[in-house]
């Protein structure tokens, strides 16, 4: 019966990612599934961002395991406001800058985990 169904879901793990398009621009987003999201952005399945339409090939340049959606959204907002140079510095250094997230818990940057984009290509 419907009353016996467990409606409690496990909290999702959220990722922050940066994708490079054919113009060398970086797009920032969040997802619970990097594999699904890159497929959406590439037009292989529905749901990709309009900002990336027609700008392929698209490649992950950085992926960070963040945690919950609220934290991931805060990271996304901050990273999207960075200059091109600072975004590329994140890609190159494979770390989120601590000073960018002063108002967030100090542990967040320390505990965010860089994941090789190759795992999801």
Predicted feature residues:
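GIY-YIG nuclease catalytic motif and its immediate N-terminal context
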Residues: 1-47, 53-66, 70-77, 95-121
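Short arginine-rich
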Residues: 77-92
